[in-house]
Regions:
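The alpha-helix within a helix-turn-helix
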Residues: 15, 26, 55
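DNA major-groove recognition helix of helix-turn-helix/homeodomain DNA-binding modules
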Residues: 49-64
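Short alpha-helical DNA-recognition segment
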Residues: 20-38
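A short, Lys/Arg-rich alpha-helix, primarily the initiator
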Residues: 1-17
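Residue-level signal for the short linker/turn that defines the boundary of a DNA-recognition helix
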Residues: 9, 19-20, 46-49
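Residues within the helices of the helix-turn-helix
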Residues: 12, 23, 52
Length: 69
């Protein structure tokens, strides 16, 4: 069995619930807007530290924001 786990996310939905733009969220967590966009579209997998900071900023548990597909 050679299946690759892909980390998916609900970042865009959680950000919208909080009424935050990509720019505002990026400022809150200390990364570029492009990084937020890349995470939302699955082009970039955040580090454990960034994933935790995103969870805190969006008031979500890790498993509410990220999941394996």
């Amino acid at each position: 069995m050679n299946q690759e786990l892909v980390l998916e996310n609900h970042l865009k939905e959680a950000r919208a619930e909080k009424g935050l733009s990509q720019q505002k969220l990026s400022e809150l967590v200390g990364v570029s807007r492009n990084t937020i966009s890349s995470i939302e579209t699955g082009q970039f997998c955040p580090t454990a530290k960034l994933a935790l900071v995103l969870c805190i900023a969006l008031d979500k548990k890790f498993e509410e924001l990220f999941f394996f597909e």
